[in-house]
Design a protein with these regions (language model features):
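Ser/Thr/Asn(+Pro)-rich, low-complexity disordered segments
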Residues: 50, 56-57, 188-192, 301-312
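An amphipathic alpha-helical core segment
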Residues: 186-245
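N-terminal secretory signal peptides that target proteins for export/translocation
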Residues: 1-12
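Pan-zinc metallopeptidase signature
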Residues: 219-312
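Acidic/His-rich structured neighborhood in mature extracellular/periplasmic domains
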Residues: 45, 51-53, 60-63, 71-200, ...
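Bacterial N-terminal signal peptides
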Residues: 15-24
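Boundary at the C-terminal end of the N-terminal hydrophobic targeting segment
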Residues: 28-32
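A structural signal for well-ordered alpha-helical segments within the folded catalytic domains
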Residues: 77, 81, 163-167, 210-221, ...
């Protein structure tokens, strides 16, 4: 038989069809249509009791990502993308977050923490507006928040070395998601946190503050978006380093996210994705602290330094 003879027509058709299916599956992520940005629906407003502050939203499997008119559409879609990457394969956590009326709120570069309706009762306002460019959700305040400048890596982002959404959404997964679907999770987390502290792990670092921050900092490293070593962080900033340094925390996180291989990369390295095509950070506003919050920041620094001296 001549191996170079033309294949029968039906065989050629099946081969071409198989190749087309493979190409379609391979390129599914890059060609997928992304959720449209639209005003919150009347049903969503009623169900989540949303404030009129929110004029835009994107839905991720029914979970709302919200912003005011000042927030860019691409920021909403970027947040939706990151949330979906983190929770791939965990539809049950989506359901728990929606049932608990959790929502994700984005601050524009010239908006601040206490402008988010769920956080508007935090006082003193200047303290919180300078203290945080993102907060986790609690039953009393069911909004996870983050600044647009961090989502899109805009100029002036004070947290440019890490992704704040991953950290704050990790808190929501813990407190508003897993708390509803796994009654043993918090106790398990507390136990491995206690063991880590007893062994001297994370000594003097932000992850040592409590089991909530231990979890959120671990999730950041698991997804490859933690800070380089500084006064609040040690060398653990990747999945491999986390597995080596604190294997118990790694194992729990890996169990929750079911071995999710996704790793965070900055948006400028993902321009092929539908929501980032044609996007340019230079077209958007940069971030800067207003003068009154710079003064507040200096005061908070002095207070921390004084407290450290008193605790010596």
């Amino acid at each position: 038989m001549n191996i170079f003879s033309p294949l029968p027509e039906f065989v050629m058709f099946r081969c071409c069809l198989f190749i087309a299916i493979l190409l379609n599956l391979t390129n599914a992520d890059s060609k997928a249509e992304f959720p449209n940005v639209a005003p919150p629906t009347a049903e969503l407003v009623a169900s989540f009791q949303l404030d009129t502050f929110y004029t835009k939203h994107v839905s991720v499997k029914g979970f709302p990502v919200l912003g005011s008119a000042k927030v860019s559409d691409v920021a909403l879609q970027e947040a939706a993308y990151l949330i979906d990457q983190m929770l791939g394969g965990r539809e049950d956590i989506y359901v728990a977050l929606i049932d608990s009326k959790t929502r994700f709120a984005i601050m524009a570069p010239d908006e601040f923490t206490t402008e988010i309706p769920a956080h508007s009762d935090l006082t003193p306002k200047t303290f919180w507006d300078r203290r945080a460019r993102g907060l986790g959700a609690t039953p009393a305040r069911p909004a996870v928040s983050c600044g647009e400048e961090n989502l899109l890596c805009l100029r002036g982002d004070p947290y440019h070395e890490e992704n704040i959404l991953v950290h704050e959404f990790a808190h929501a997964i813990h407190d508003m998601g897993l708390a509803r679907i796994d009654g043993k999770f918090d106790d398990r987390l507390q136990a491995i946190y206690d063991q880590a502290i007893q062994e001297g792990l994370w000594n003097g670092k932000y992850a040592a503050n409590n089991h909530h921050e231990y979890w959120a900092e671990g999730v950041q490293s698991y997804f490859g978006t933690n800070r380089l070593p500084d006064h609040d962080h040690n060398h653990v900033d990747t999945r491999d380093k986390l597995k080596e340094y604190d294997p118990r925390l790694f194992a729990l996180i890996d169990e929750v996210f079911r071995g999710n291989p996704w790793q965070y990369t900055r948006p400028e390295h993902r321009r092929e994705l539908p929501h980032l095509r044609g996007w340019d950070a230079e077209d958007l506003s940069s971030f800067s602290w207003p003068e009154h919050l710079l003064r507040e920041g200096a005061k908070q620094k002095r207070d921390r330094e004084q407290a450290a001296i008193e605790n010596e």
